[in-house]
Amino acid sequence: MEEIKEMGPTLPACPPCVMVIFGATGDLTARKLFPALYNLTKEGRLSENFVCVGFARRPKSHEQFREEMRQAIQNFSHSSEIDIRVWESLEHRIFYHQANFSEAEGYSSLRSFLESVDQKYGTKGNRLFYLSTPPDYFQEIIRNLNRHQLFYHEQGAQQPWSRLIIEKPFGVDLQTAQELQQCIDANINEESVYRIDHYLGKETVQNILTIRFANTLFESCWNSQYIDHVQISVSESIGIGSRGNFFEKSGMLRDMVQNHLMQLLCLLTMEPPSEFSSAEIKKEKIKILKKILPIREEDVIRGQYGEGVVQGVSVSGYREEENVDPNSLVETYVALKLFIDNPRWKGVPFYLQAGKRLPKRTTDIAVIFKKSSYDLFNSENCPLCPLENDLLIIRIQPDEGVALQFNCKVPGTNKLVRPVKMDFRYDSYFNTVTPEAYERLLCDCILGDRTLFTSNEEVLASWELFSPLLEQWSKIRPIFPNYIAGSLRPQGADELLSRDGRAWRSY
């Protein structure tokens, strides 16, 4: 099929605003945020009246910060080479504000600086605050934004707006998530809070609802009558790198499963919303979260990688990583089975797995359909045609796309049947570069669209599900490490499926 060279209606341009990044010297700013801002500028999405201010503790001049961000764009943007004209149009609107997150003077001077930016650059008083800091600072920053009148409490259609983006984790359990929400409620407006899960900004994830609800082919069989089980897998070849301090406080369940994987599960299983709006989609996602049955201890496997070889390179075990306790009991792999107690999904097992130091980097969803109920292809009538399950594979990364596997007769044979695949890939079908997740999410926030952001109700419902499991884990000492770096997974994760007569899909 020919490439599609003409795209549909373009996304709207963003209104003027000033974006303040707290923790602007961190990896997220360099690897994700500024490459996204550069690409949005290149595509004409950002207003010429957009300004970005980095807020961090390290002493740094405007010029130093700009040069560091230019290097970051060069290193991490999906654009092949930096376009000097695009960079120059953005560069003079980038500033650095050196201050401590806990000191009042830093916020007072920030307020004065933003007022001068409004006057000079025409940002119209619109403000986007981005918390790209460790979660320990969230509440302190939120309180200071309110205390120093940096956040507007009354926001109407004709008034300037202020919005807050929070990066996960949104607490480390139900209690801390509730404490964070109490701080938000006491200081700012919940409708102005955008909890970012970058998985929701990925094109294939956004496409899940379209695949389901715009195609009778899929939605008509999207239920327990036709689906045998579902697998959602996140495999990472990397270890924890320099994130030892963070990962020791989180682990894989908190870092990946409680948020990213649960969002994928909700989109995959929710009922059709009454309308395609942020509020209605969130309503259906919350219904799903509340219908997930309590997770049994025997249906969860946790693991931690030991030393091994990944893609031909010898690597250390988790306990030998930088800033990691040499006796750490933190999990780097989780597999679990859960059930949704509603008419559509009753009895269908959902298997989720996420792990580090696995053979390769991939994230996908596999919908495994039941085998045909017709008796035409049984072993007596057709000894050479054992049927495979039909599969729908939604690839989220890399090679974003969708593949459908089904059974077909082999040409030139009598009754030989083999599985074949139809494969759609974004990069080969659409003549365009798939936008990075942060490009879409930053624009949506500036435009005031909360559809792809996580609500407080979703966060709390997810923690209600996983906090009891974390409590159980705290009382049991696992035997770690229990899988070799570069292997597929711990043995117990294979047994989780094999005792049900199933197996993880190979990749």
From Swiss-Prot:
One of the protein's GO biological processes: glucose metabolic process
Coiled coil (residue ranges): none
Reaction catalysis annotation: D-glucose 6-phosphate + NADP(+) = 6-phospho-D-glucono-1,5-lactone + NADPH + H(+)
Keyword Oxidoreductase recorded: yes
Binding site for NADP(+): 57, 168
GO MF: glucose-6-phosphate dehydrogenase activity; NADP binding
Record keywords: Carbohydrate metabolism, Glucose metabolism, NADP, Oxidoreductase
Disulfide bonding pattern of the chain: none
Pfam families: G6PD_C (PF02781), G6PD_N (PF00479)
Domain of life of the source: Bacteria
Pathway given in the UniProt record: Carbohydrate degradation; pentose phosphate pathway; D-ribulose 5-phosphate from D-glucose 6-phosphate (oxidative stage): step 1/3
InterPro entries recorded: G6P_DH, G6P_DH_AS, G6P_DH_C, G6P_DH_NAD-bd, NAD(P)-bd_dom_sf
Any single GO CC term annotated in Swiss-Prot or TrEMBL for this entry: cytosol
Residues annotated as the enzyme's active site: 260 (proton acceptor)
Listed EC numbers: 1.1.1.49
Binding site for substrate: 198, 202, 236, 255, 356
PROSITE patterns assigned: G6P_DEHYDROGENASE
NCBIfam families: zwf
Role of this protein: Catalyzes the oxidation of glucose 6-phosphate to 6-phosphogluconolactone.
Record-stated family: Belongs to the glucose-6-phosphate dehydrogenase family.
Protein name: Glucose-6-phosphate 1-dehydrogenase
Organism: Chlamydia muridarum (strain MoPn / Nigg)
